[in-house]
Curated annotation (Swiss-Prot):
Keywords: Ribonucleoprotein, Ribosomal protein. Belongs to the bacterial ribosomal protein bL33 family. This is Large ribosomal subunit protein bL33A. One of its GO terms (molecular function) is structural constituent of ribosome. InterPro entries: Ribosomal_bL33, Ribosomal_bL33_CS, Ribosomal_bL33_sf, Ribosomal_zn-bd. The keyword Ribosomal protein applies. One of its GO terms (cellular component) is ribosome. It comes from the Bacteria. It comes from Pediococcus pentosaceus (strain ATCC 25745 / CCUG 21536 / LMG 10740 / 183-1w). GO terms for biological process: translation.
Length: 49
């Protein structure tokens, strides 16, 4: 079952990216390195509800 998630920047707490994931394959929270336009660099983004 795929669910929609929001990715939040760990440095500035900006919620920039929307994505989806399969809960059966990835039960824990997703962490990705993505570009943050507010910081103007690549930062760690964590999954939020």
């Amino acid at each position: 079952m795929r669910v929609h998630i929001t990715l939040e920047c760990t440095e500035c707490h900006n919620r920039q990216y929307l994505s989806n994931k399969n809960k059966r394959n990835n039960p824990d929270r997703l962490e990705l390195n993505k570009y943050c336009p507010r910081e103007r660099k690549v930062t760690l983004h964590k999954e939020t509800k």
